[in-house]
């Protein structure tokens, strides 16, 4: 599964869903005391198992050793990982059409409802509003949207930024992003005029 982290990051780069130093991925395995996460400031198209950062978990807290440089979005990953008892991957990418759709004012949750096949397999949360990258506000709002109303969503859009998805492994999280990116591409190619239901109050409410 650690090898798959590099595999999905390289595939995301090939699809132009990230530039060389964008995106991040983490894995926490059931019954273990380590969080595996991509490092900060490295080219994500050349991520391999030996470059993955390993962080010890002690009494529910991350123990960062001196010199370790995990992704700047570590807090967002940990919010989504720490309360989950099983094996989970968190994947954050910047897919072009998904970001473009949000920039155009679409709520990805509402758009997904227009495509039954996506809505069947992938639960899409309401968009997160525009917030600074690597901020606690982004981490908290992303987590809040992913569990809003007691529902565990699979993916959430982050306005003018990217998307964050979860899965039992990196490829499952990747597939959620792929489905949403596909419908965003279709909608934009068709110049689809979806009723704009997104507003700042809704995006901040969780």
Map each language-model feature to its residues:
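Glycine-rich flexible loops
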Residues: 1-206
């Amino acid at each position: 599964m650690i090898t798959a982290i590099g595999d999905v990051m390289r595939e995301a780069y090939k699809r132009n869903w990230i530039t060389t130093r964008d995106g991040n991925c983490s894995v926490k395995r059931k019954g273990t005391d380590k969080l595996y996460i991509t490092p900060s400031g490295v080219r994500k198209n050349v991520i391999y198992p030996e470059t993955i950062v390993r962080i010890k978990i002690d009494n529910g807290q991350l123990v960062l050793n001196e010199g370790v440089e995990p992704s700047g979005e570590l807090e967002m990953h940990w919010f989504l990982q720490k309360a989950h008892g099983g094996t989970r991957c968190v994947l954050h990418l910047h897919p072009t059409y998904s970001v473009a759709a949000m920039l155009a004012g679409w709520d990805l949750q509402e758009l997904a409802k227009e495509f039954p096949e996506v809505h069947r397999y992938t639960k899409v949360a309401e968009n997160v509003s525009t917030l600074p990258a690597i901020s606690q506000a982004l981490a908290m709002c992303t987590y809040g949207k992913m569990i809003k109303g007691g529902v565990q969503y699979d993916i959430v859009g982050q306005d003018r930024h990217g998307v964050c998805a979860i899965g039992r492994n990196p490829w499952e999280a990747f597939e959620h992003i792929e489905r949403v990116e596909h419908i965003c591409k279709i909608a934009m190619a068709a110049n689809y005029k979806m009723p704009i239901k997104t507003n700042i109050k809704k995006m901040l409410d969780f």
